[in-house]
Amino acid sequence: MSEDLAIKLNDCTSKGYVIAPAGFGKTHLIAMAVRASGGRQLILTHTFAGVNSIKTKMADLGVRASQFQVDTIASWALRLCLAYPKASGWKIENPTSKQWNKLYECCSHLLGKRFIREAVSSSYIGLYVDEYQDCSDVQHDLVCNLAEFLPSRLLGDPLQSIFDFDDGKPVDWEVSVYPKFDCLGQLEVPWRWVKAKSPELGEWLKNVRRKIELGQKIDLLAQLPPSVIRTYTQPEYLAAKQYTALCGMLNNNESVIALHGGDNQSKNKTHLLAKTMAGRFSSIEEIEGKDLHSFIKKLVAVKTVQAGFLLVVKFAMKCLTGVPSALTAGTRRGEVTKLRSTTKYPLVLQAANDYLTDPSSSHLKAFFETLKSNPETSAYRRDLLYRFLNVLKIHIDGQATTLVEAGILYQREMRHSGRPINHRKLIGTTLLVKGLEYDHAVILDADSLDAKDLYVAMTRGAKSLTIIGTVRHLPA
């Protein structure tokens, strides 16, 4: 029972871990354990979406605000180091992606100091770390330093450890967790599927998990619950099957995630498929937004307005289908073009001419807005498009002096606000949707996924799972 496990977590005076499979009520468990606490607990996770999810669950279960503080590991470590700049050796308020590991090292060193331990101990009586499989090795070192003087509970799922760290590696549970932390328990009820009235799917996924842990294969010709749809295809018909499967998901307003694996090559596949679907499904971007920031840097570096506009058109084609059809031949060449009675889309032409005459952010935003509402076009990378429109708004409103600064500022804001997209039909990679829940999940190329990617993909849909592939047994 999770109530008993919550009490066990609250009573823990040393350091332990809980195995929490996807969709089994981990956030609920944390909230119940904290509700039983006689003091203030520190809860650390990895994303601001995770922070908000925990806060919402705390409110739902009536946990008092005085009983907890929830934050990301990154922002908590940064704030502690900035509070003691001399002792920590850290003064950078906005670290770049390559500076975070150094920050974690500084924070770990700081936590070794007696006066810091006393300060932290006076603020909290215990620690919870959520989504522990997403910890890097340097974050794990930081947590271990906290665990030396605070009762610490780690909650996570080694089967979902698919994060790619630019500089560092994910924590190895076999080496760093199991031998050094006590096992406090494992969650057993697949609540996500129980609540979605798909208990058979939940039990099937629980069995799938057991097989993956034992290194066994999943037989897709064995009896499957009605909510698991196996779509067999020959390799040469894979793209056609993907298209047909997604078209079949368009007749309702329920959320759908179509998934490729988490490798770099798969990112391009998601955008290509969204383009093929003419934007009826929209692809999602990596949090870092490399394509956006690369474009902004190129745009501000151009020597001529014409060269800048040609870059703009190229970027627009990365976001929307049908862009060339909405532009006149002269506009496509980056020329101010005269409006004629035969001009098919005068509003687009006028917006392009305005930008070519005065290349301001307001004219650029107007051009994209006009393109977006044109009948020839359809946004297929809404996430990318809306991020860029938000960057332009920040620049127009005077919150940043340059477009590059506006991009950096928006990137920081987005970590709190989340992706600027509310489209219900999405295409992404396992890496981008880990921890998220949708009504339906479609695995686009099951043969290509390893065991962990496969498990993450299979557990995203609360009501149904469609598996497209060429083989009978998975992982292939």
Show where each model-derived region lies.
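The feature marks helicase ATPase cores and/or their adjacent C-terminal helical subdomains
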Residues: 1-476
